[in-house]
Each structure stands twice: as structure tokens, then as C-alpha cells.
Amino acid sequence: MQEKSIRLGIVVAEFNYDITQLMLQKALSHARFLNVEVKVVIKVPGTFDMPLAIKKLLEKDFIDAVVTLGAVIKGETKHDELVASQTARKIVDLSTEFNKPVTLGIIGHGATHEQAVERIEEYATRAVEAAIKLVQRTRKLDELKEIKETVIIE
């Protein structure tokens, strides 16, 4: 039986564009390399603005998972902590509400600009890989009926 294709949506923040645009390029390239289709890329002003776009994508039947890409850079106040924690919390809530994976490819909080630049490829590719693995594994979990012994889903 041929495995069903995986269709991703990507939400990318425009704030810290020099970083997030490179993250988007890396994510798209990695998805192509892994033979996964990116159906929609939506840009939002900042990381804090992601939840509505994520929700809209999760409502679509042609989206199996959403990858988020952003960079929350440390400033002189604790604003970065607020943005990162509130966004991450809402991302988790949306994932469980819609029963679809939403992966966290957001650099920060507390990262300097230099640290964020160093993490561009790692965060972008890991977010894509996590989305793919979660879709594959939750599909396997959905196929389980009655079981009599421990099942490990990889």
C-alpha cells in the first residue's frame, strides 16, 4: 500500500526578515528534498501574529500539518519572553484543538541576532522533519484498532 502524501502549510514571521526569509528558503528546500508538498506559505507581521494564520490553515482539509518559522530576538526588556511564551502556548492549544501537528520552528526567546543566524538551518529543517514524523506517526496511531501487546510507533 502506498503511503498517503503529506501536505504542509508554513506560517513565517516577517519580523527579523533577514533571518526568517532564510528559514523559509531552508524549510522549502528541505520539504522538497523529503518529497513533501508545501501547499501554502503565509507570511504574518510577527511571531505573535501567527495563531490566527495557523488556525485558518488547520481548518483546511488539504493541510496535514503546519510548520511555524520565526525569530524572537532578545531586547532590552522582557518583551521577547512574553511573545515567545504566549505564541508557543497558543500553538500547542491549536494543535490539540484541531488534532493536527503544529511544529515550533521559532528561534528564541533570549537569542541574540548572531545566535539566531547560527540556528537558521537547524530550526527550519527540524520543524519540517517534526511535522512529517508527527503526521506519519499519528496516521499509524489512527489505524490502530484493538491491540493485545505494546505497540511502538516510529
UniProtKB/Swiss-Prot annotation:
Top-level enzyme category: transferase
Transferase keyword on record: yes
EC number: 2.5.1.78
Amino-acid positions noted as binding 5-amino-6-(D-ribitylamino)uracil in the UniProt annotation, renumbered to this chain: 15, 47-49, 71-73, 104
Superkingdom as given in the UniProt entry: Archaea
Reaction catalysis annotation: (2S)-2-hydroxy-3-oxobutyl phosphate + 5-amino-6-(D-ribitylamino)uracil = 6,7-dimethyl-8-(1-D-ribityl)lumazine + phosphate + 2 H2O + H(+)
Active site (record annotation): 79
HAMAP family per UniProt: Lumazine_synth (MF_00178)
Protein name stated in the entry: 6,7-dimethyl-8-ribityllumazine synthase
Taxonomic source organism: Saccharolobus solfataricus (strain ATCC 35092 / DSM 1617 / JCM 11322 / P2) (Sulfolobus solfataricus)
Upper lineage: Archaea, Thermoproteota, Thermoprotei, Sulfolobales, Sulfolobaceae
Protein encoded by which gene: ribH
